[in-house]
Amino acid sequence: MNNIRKTHPLMKIVNSSFIDLPAPSNISSWWNFGSLLGICLIAQILTGLFLAMHYTSDTMTAFSSVTHICRDVNYGWLIRYLHANGASMFFICLFLHVGRGLYYGSYMYLETWNIGVLLLFAVMATAFMGYVLPWGQMSFWGATVITNLLSAIPYIGTNLVEWIWGGFSVDKATLTRFFAFHFILPFIVAALAGIHLLFLHETGSNNPSGLDSDTDKIPFHPYYTIKDILGALIMITALSSLVLFSPDLLGDPDNYIPANPLNTPPHIKPEWYFLFAYAILRSIPNKLGGVLALVLSIAILAVIPLLHTAKQRSMMFRPLSQCLFWILVADLFTLTWIGGQPVEHPFVVIGQLASVIYFMLILLIMPATSMIENQLLKW
């Protein structure tokens, strides 16, 4: 009798993706983040669905409905904080996943990488719109400031902003459409993730050495299923600890004040995972220039394959590039810190320096260093 796992049309797809998938024998824990992101996405969709059952997207009742969820709904507080901190977990995994791709040269799989960049943009858009929904002070002013950036686009800017707002300011129409988009986008993200996997399975996974691993493959199950379960348990433990011990650690206290268009908070800032991009935006005095830099800070990932000048794929055996990679990581931490600081001396100058270093490292210093390494290796 034929094995149903290998003959059934649906099971065949599952089998070739998660069971009999040939995987390199030497992939490290840095390859766990794909599955962790999948778990994050499923958790966010499920908790979000239950929140949407009790949430009302109306300016008069949005804040109250979130309070109602936390106070009156069975385990509503748990669902709400799992959703809010689940987003933070999602971005931690995303940043580590992208960092892994940069370090080990996974960006050489062009289609997979470009879909990944699209995914990053989609998840960032989803998270931004989700932050607006509780309709606290930071929700309202964050939405006002970030959507207002589009007015920097020449000629159509002002019309575009008013079209997105559905009026002359962030109001009921804005909140309603943001809720609609926030609900639908995760399903688009799930579809994109499917395409991401489809392209990945065309080539197979990269590995830490960056060398071809076709001669030494092992089945995904049981080796990497067990490894992924361990990673998932560690992540779930971290998320549970955050949710149960300090659920507001990563949030802004201002968001516990209902939105008030007549009162601007002293420091308008987004969630921690956007602070690096926000710092780059603020470090440019010109509005349009700032918006371009903001978009480019993420879009620059798409051109990284074109900037790969090294003869080796991975950074595993390239100590100079390794040093620069960790300088880039330190620079991103610096930008994140600056994004949360007020716009005053010395933070402005530090932010400008960190922004210049960020773009210089990626566009100039790292490709040049790779060429020097080629020379040193006489390749």
Swiss-Prot record:
Pfam families: Cytochrom_B_C, Cytochrome_B. GO terms for biological process: mitochondrial electron transport, ubiquinol to cytochrome c. Heme b b566 binds at residues 97, 196. It is found in: Mitochondrion inner membrane. A ubiquinone binds at residue 201. It comes from the Eukaryota. Belongs to the cytochrome b family. Component of the ubiquinol-cytochrome c reductase complex (complex III or cytochrome b-c1 complex) that is part of the mitochondrial respiratory chain. The b-c1 complex mediates electron transfer from ubiquinol to cytochrome c. Contributes to the generation of a proton gradient across the mitochondrial membrane that is then used for ATP synthesis. This is Cytochrome b. The lineage of its organism: Eukaryota, Metazoa, Chordata, Craniata, Vertebrata.
